[in-house]
């Protein structure tokens, strides 16, 4: 979400807060936020379980779907739209069928969420196309920080 808001702020300039009075724009941001969150959560679960399997002999990767669904089901309390939850669960199931737990953690594990940020950001397509590389790299760099924190936390 932070990356989405920073991207919007950068693209809109100093008057970006004025757009928060626009209900249509707010609806777009909210939809983008939840779609990005859903895929980022998928990436994080896949990364975490893959990393734990490889480096800590974690054998319960079959719990991935249950973990994801439990988190999303709780997000309805925070306003996550049910239709986004249903689509996200379907996408998770499809991705889960293809995952190789032994290599996921090292094979562009957060690429899907970076692409989702790019896809859902409510920015004009002609401007977005100019920003593609910057947006994707920005998201990947943010995830690098998370990966470092995760590695430190599990060593404690």
What are these regions (language model features)?
Residues 1-24, 67, 116-119:
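Amphipathic alpha-helical segments in structured regions that serve as interaction surfaces
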Residues 35-39, 66, 80-83, 87:
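Residues within HEAT/ARM-like alpha-solenoid scaffolds
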Residues 5, 9, 45-53, 69-76, ...:
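Alpha-helical repeat scaffolds in large eukaryotic proteins
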Residues 49-64, 80-84:
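Short, solvent-exposed secondary-structure capping/transition elements
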Residues 26-30, 61, 129-132, 136:
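Alpha-helical rod/repeat scaffolding segments in eukaryotic adaptors/tethers
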Residues 27-32, 65-79:
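Eukaryote-specific, cytoplasm-facing alpha-helical/coiled-coil scaffolding segments in long proteins
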Residues 73-156:
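Helix-driven interaction modules
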Residues 10-58:
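N-terminal interaction modules that seed assembly of large macromolecular complexes
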């Amino acid at each position: 979400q932070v990356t989405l808001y920073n991207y919007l702020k950068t693209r809109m300039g100093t008057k970006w807060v004025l757009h928060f009075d626009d209900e249509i724009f707010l609806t777009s941001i909210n939809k983008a936020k939840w779609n990005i969150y859903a895929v980022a959560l998928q990436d994080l679960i896949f990364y975490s379980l893959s990393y734990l399997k490889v480096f800590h002999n974690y054998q319960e990767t079959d719990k991935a779907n249950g973990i994801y669904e439990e988190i999303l089901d709780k997000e309805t309390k925070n306003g996550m739209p049910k239709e986004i939850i249903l689509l996200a669960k379907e996408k998770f199931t499809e991705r889960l069928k293809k995952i190789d737990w032994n290599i996921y953690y090292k094979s562009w594990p957060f690429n899907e969420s970076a692409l989702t940020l790019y896809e859902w950001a409510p920015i004009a397509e002609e401007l977005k196309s100019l920003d593609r590389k910057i947006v994707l790299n920005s998201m990947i760099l943010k995830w690098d920080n998370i990966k470092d924190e995760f590695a430190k936390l599990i060593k404690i």
